[in-house]
Amino acid sequence: MQDNIEKLKHYGYEIVEPAHGMLANGDMGDGRMPDEELLFEYIVKEIAFEKDMTGKKVLVTAGATVEAIDPVRFITNHSSGKMGFALAKNATLRGADVTLVMGKCDSEPPVFVNTVKVQSAKDMYDAVIERADSMDIIVKAAAVADYRPKNVSSEKVKKQDGNMSIELLSLIHI
């Protein structure tokens, strides 16, 4: 069976792998029918778009970066990641090999993309720079922080009477 699947892949056929979950015999494992939404995404990927980006490697950034103040508090923004997700999905549907570098996002990333999850602006910078030379196209749609706290406490900062001031440092642009 595996030899036949490998032959089909060799000839360019897309194989939808079985899903993981509860099987008919009560065991957990691979062998379930993939869910309908995933099957639909496979069909759309194969027939709905011209494959004008086949062979292209695309990196897309999405979402918000998170800059820690302490282990509990952080500075971020309201970016949902939807724009970056839409760009990544569209490039994938057009045949590109897509890497999505994502910060904090409101939803799950699109299927068929290589996902790299990051937290801070430095994490995102490092992830992009590490992959940049191997990409044909880079789309920067993330909402990256412009500043980070100068001092990050290793413990939760206790509430005190009066105001709290946080000195911020400018961050490098990606």
Spans of model-derived segments:
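Glycine-rich phosphate/diphosphate-binding loop of Rossmann-like nucleotide-binding domains
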Residues: 2, 6, 56-120
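Mobile active-site "lid"/loop adjacent to the S-adenosyl-L-methionine
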Residues: 151-167
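Conserved small/polar residues in nucleotide/adenosyl-binding loops
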Residues: 172-174
